[in-house]
Amino acid sequence: MNHMGMNHMEMHHHMGMNHTDDNITMPPHHHPTTSASHSHGGGDSMMMMPMTFYFDFKNVNLLFSGLVINTPGEMAGAFVAVFLLAMFYEGLKIAREGLLRKSQVSIRYNSMPVPGPNGTILMETHKTVGQQMLSFPHLLQTVLHIIQVVISYFLMLIFMTYNGYLCIAVAAGAGTGYFLFSWKKAVVVDITEHCH
């Protein structure tokens, strides 16, 4: 249907709508995660996300459209799962650091005596560097990095639901994971860390 030649100012008289009214009031919605906007006749409606923190367990979408929390038991299960995911994320970061330390560039210095001028003996030092881009440690680090990035974005999206229970699960899981896994870690700041 071509709407290019239509006069939209005359439409409001026939459709009962006044588009020039500045005092439009919308009826309050009952749940902060779902608010249907006006439909354009195609049956599709837009879901509004909350912009403030709320504590509820009904109709909470968790990452995927088919994963909806509607009961206190489902929220408790989601809390535990998100808590464990955040803990796993912290453990994965520490594990990657340990693997990186073990597989870092191995530099060996070999000293050999060589004859010098006037019959003196000099020590010549050779440096051998061993690290390749297509090595197993580097490929493993790459796969683990991809997993870490995906998990970090999942945790960010979970936090962005603004559901208080799920936000607490992310923060508590990350804190517990850090407490459990990084107590032996040297104080190093990772500037490439995602979502913190």
From Swiss-Prot:
Coiled coil stretches, renumbered = none
InterPro entries, per database record: Cop_transporter (IPR007274)
How the protein sits in the membrane? Multi-pass membrane protein
Q: Where is this motif: Bis-His motif?
A: 13-14
Is the keyword Calcium assigned to this protein? no
Which family, according to the similarity comment? Belongs to the copper transporter (Ctr) (TC 1.A.56) family. SLC31A subfamily.
Present the record's domain note: The C-terminal domain mediates copper(1+) binding and is involved in the copper(1+)-dependent-ATOX1 interaction. The C-terminal domain appears to act to limit transport through the pore by regulating the rate of exit of copper ions at the intracellular side. The N-terminal domain can collect copper(2+) from copper(2+) carriers in blood. The N-terminal domain, in the trimeric arrangement, tunes its reactivity with copper, promoting copper(2+) reduction and copper(1+) stabilization. The bis-His motif directly coordinate to copper(2+).
| Location of Cysteine sulfenic acid (-SOH) modifications | 195
Its name, as the record gives it, is High affinity copper uptake protein 1
Compartments annotated for it: namely: Cell membrane; Early endosome membrane; Recycling endosome membrane; Apical cell membrane
Question: Which Gene Ontology molecular-function terms are recorded?
Answer: copper ion binding; copper ion transmembrane transporter activity; identical protein binding; silver ion transmembrane transporter activity; xenobiotic transmembrane transporter activity
User: Hey, which stretches end up on the Cytoplasmic side?
Assistant: 96-138, 184-196
> Subunit composition?
Homotrimer; is stabilized by cisplatin via interactions between cisplatin and the Met motif, and could be crucial for the copper(2+) reduction process and copper(1+) stabilization. Heterotrimer between SLC31A1, CCS and SOD1; this heterotrimer is copper(1+)-mediated and its maintenance is regulated through SOD1 activation. Interacts with KDR; this interaction is induced upon VEGFA stimulation leading to SLC31A1 and KDR subsequent co-internalization to early endosomes, thereby activating KDR downstream signaling in endothelial cells.
Keyword Zinc-finger applies: no
Q: Which gene encodes it?
A: Slc31a1
Summary of the tissues where the protein is detected: Expressed in the tubules in the inner cortex and inner medulla of the kidney, the villi of the small intestine, the choroid plexus of the brain, the stroma of the ovary, the seminiferous tubules of the testes, and the sclera of the eye. Expressed in intestinal epithelial cells, with an increase expression from the crypt to the tip of the villus. Mainly expressed in both proximal and distal tubular cells in kidneys.
Q: Which residues carry this modification: Phosphothreonine?
A: 120
| Residues bearing attached sugar chains per UniProt | 23, 34
Topological domain (Extracellular) residues are: 1-74, 160-162
Task: Report what the Swiss-Prot or TrEMBL entry states about this protein's PTMs.
Answer: O-Glycosylation at Thr-34 protects from proteolytic cleavage in the N-terminal extracellular domain. Proteolytic cleavage, leading to a truncated form, is facilitated by SLC31A2 and initiated preferentially by CTSL and to a minor extend by CTSB in endolysosomal compartments. A post-CTSL/cathepsin L processing occurs to yield to the fully truncated form.
Q: Which organism is it from?
A: Mus musculus
